[in-house]
Each structure stands twice: as C-alpha cells, then as structure tokens.
A protein has these predicted regions:
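DNA breakage-rejoining catalytic core of tyrosine-based enzymes
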Residues: 1-13, 60-69, 82-85, 161-176
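Basic, Lys/Arg- and aromatic-enriched nucleic-acid-binding interface segment
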Residues: 7-35, 39, 124, 171-203
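Conserved tyrosine-mediated DNA breakage-rejoining catalytic core shared by Y-recombinases
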Residues: 35, 40, 44-74, 208-210
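Key DNA-contacting residues within the recognition helix of helix-turn-helix
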Residues: 43, 104, 129, 152-153, ...
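A short, basic/aromatic helix-end/turn motif that makes direct DNA contacts
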Residues: 44-50, 141-149, 156-157, 196, ...
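Active-site/catalytic core of tyrosine-dependent DNA strand-transfer enzymes
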Residues: 67-116
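Short, basic (Lys/Arg/His-rich) helix/loop patches that form interaction surfaces
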Residues: 104-146, 160-161, 182-183
Length: 210
C-alpha cells in the first residue's frame, strides 16, 4: 500500500532555487531535491565525487545523473570554493565544511521563505517519487541506493506502469547484477557481464571478440 509522504510544492522549490543559484543553501537543496542525496551524503560530498565530464555524482553505492540546475550550481561553486576545501558544501564565512546541523538549519531557512514545511529527507523522498513516475524500479533503485523491495513497500502508489520494450530480469536481480557490474568495472568479468546483460550477446559471441 505504501506510505504517504510530505511533499514540497514544485513551483515554490523552483522559486527558492532561482534565488539561490550557487549559494550553500542552493547547493544543499539541489543535492537533496534534484539528486536525492541524504543529509549525511551532502555533508560528506567531496569535489572528487562530482564528475562534470560524465555528468554524474559518484557516491560509494551509486552514481546519480547531474541535473542541469545542479551542474550549473556546482560548477560555479567549484570555481569559487574548490581550492579552499575538498568538500562541496562549505560555510561562506569560515570556508570550512558545514556540520550536519548547520546544513539542516540553512536549508530550513530557505524552505521557510516559501512556506515549505518539509525537511531534507522529505526532499530526498520527493526525488524518489519523481523518478518512479518516469523510470522503472531497477533504475530508481540504482540512483536512490534503495533496494527494490524497499521501494515497492514504501512508494508503490507513486509508480507509473509503462509497457516494457523487452523481457527484464526480476527487479531485485537486475539491481544486484548492476551492482556487480559496477564493482567489476572494466575488468574482463565486468565487460562480459555487461555485454551479456545489456547487449544480449551470447557467450560465443563475446569470446569471438577476444
């Protein structure tokens, strides 16, 4: 049946982001609402995890595509702040990493300016909901870091059914396979798994490439 979540008003969020194009609160809210990062992930995020060329945020358990608004914000902050500290979110005053409490307080002030009674976890949940409205379970599991079973248990009412172009693995199996491919990277095993999974190649076809 799922849960009922406290969701922000989209128009209000866009107004807040427009007022904060590259400030710390602008970065915090974009990372939570547009990228689905938790408060601890925002606190710990470092510049070497932001892949501007690949347009993704590389977290320990997942890679999250960079939304254009987030990319623009982080590019400007990178120019201004990257040489001062390796952390993405730092204080404008001290130029040091913000503790979690300061991140919550700064985001709260920005959200209150538009009467949004939500917190950073609510923004992460809203990210998951929006992803489920346009993508399948395995994809949302990959970008959110949540297991498919957790997503189904909490967010099932938000999933939009779409016709499948081809038979797929059971969602949890596909997510686990994706994790293995991520861990193997460009190794022989990783490439073989990727070719068999995504390109539907047979073992003999893969061997002929070697």
């Amino acid at each position: 049946m799922g849960h009922t979540f406290n969701r922000p008003d989209e128009a209000a969020m866009l107004r807040i982001l427009e007022r904060h194009p590259h400030s710390p609160e602008g970065a915090i809210l974009r990372l939570a609402w547009l990228e689905g990062l938790s408060r601890s992930e925002i606190t710990e995020l470092r510049w070497d995890q932001v892949d501007f060329e690949g347009k993704a945020i590389q977290l320990p358990d997942r890679a999250v595509p960079l939304e254009p608004s987030t990319e623009a914000c982080l590019r400007e902050r990178h120019v201004r702040c990257a040489l001062r500290d390796p952390h993405v979110v730092i204080s404008e005053r001290s130029k040091k990493p913000m503790p979690p409490e300061s991140i919550s307080r700064l985001s709260r002030l920005a959200l209150d300016s538009e009467g949004q009674k939500v917190n950073l976890m609510d923004l992460r949940h809203d990210f998951v909901i929006r992803q489920l409205q346009t993508h399948d379970w395995p994809y949302v599991a990959r970008v959110s870091g949540m297991a498919v079973s957790t997503l189904r248990g909490s967010f099932s009412q938000y999933f939009q059914e779409r016709p499948s172009a081809a038979p797929e693995l059971p969602p949890d199996s596909e997510y686990l396979l994706w994790r293995i491919v991520q861990q193997e990277g460009s190794s022989v095993v990783g490439l073989a798994l990727w070719m068999g999974w995504k390109l539907q190649m047979q073992p003999g076809e893969i061997l002929n490439l070697t």
